[in-house]
Structures are given as C-alpha cells and as structure tokens.
Design a protein with these regions (language model features):
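Sec-dependent signal peptide recognition
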Residues: 1-2
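Active-site-adjacent structural elements in enzyme catalytic domains
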Residues: 107
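Short N-proximal segments of mature Sec-exported proteins
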Residues: 16-82
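Short, compact, well-ordered microdomains
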Residues: 73-104
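N-terminal signal peptide c-region/cleavage motif recognized by signal peptidases
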Residues: 10-12
Length: 107
C-alpha cells in the first residue's frame, strides 16, 4: 500500500514551512485510486488523515476555521474528491490546505 511511504516532503504554507508526514505527502492521484478501490481500509486511512489535518488546523487556530454548519464530513470528502480528480499531481496536503483556504482558514 502506498501508505508505507511515510513522507519527508516539505511544504510551504503561508510564510512557514513544515514537514508533512504520512499520507498527506502522497499525490492526489493516490487519493483518487483509494476512492475507486474496494479496499475500505485504504480509503478510510486517506479520509482520516484529511480529517485529522483539518482538526489540527482548527485547534491551532482556536476553532476559527470551520464549523459543522459550514461543511460537514461528507462535504469535505466530496470537495477533496473533486479537487484531487482535477489536480492529480498535487499533494493531498496541498488539497486540504486549498480546502482550508476556501473555508477561510488559511493563515
């Protein structure tokens, strides 16, 4: 499984850099493959990473990113599905950061 490639890929977000670990460093093409796969565990791993990143960003920013009213769990996944379909070479982390920007939560 592609998850095994735990990442040492760095990304710049706003004026700060950070290391992206795990699935977030994979390309959106892997997200799309997981979505199409019959392996529900693999799909859940990608979804959990994205939800964890969003939760951490919300915590770090004092909850100022999103509420359940602004976009629910399924809305998040649908947005990321569409984004990754359109941007297969982008990293999953960048896709989630783009979603944060859409929700007004990018620093």
């Amino acid at each position: 499984m592609a998850m095994a490639a735990a990442a040492l890929w760095s990304s710049a977000a706003s004026a700060q850099s950070y290391v992206v670990w795990g699935i977030g460093a994979e390309r959106c093409a892997a997200w799309v493959d997981a979505k199409r796969s019959s392996d529900k565990v693999q799909r859940a791993a990608y979804e959990t990473w994205a939800h964890g990143f969003l939760t951490g960003a919300g915590f770090e920013r004092g909850g100022a990113i999103m509420t359940k009213a602004s976009m629910d769990r399924d809305g998040v996944l649908k947005w990321l599905d569409d984004y990754c379909e359109a941007n297969p070479r982008m990293s999953i982390e960048r896709a989630v950061v783009a979603l944060l920007g859409r929700l007004g939560g990018e620093k």
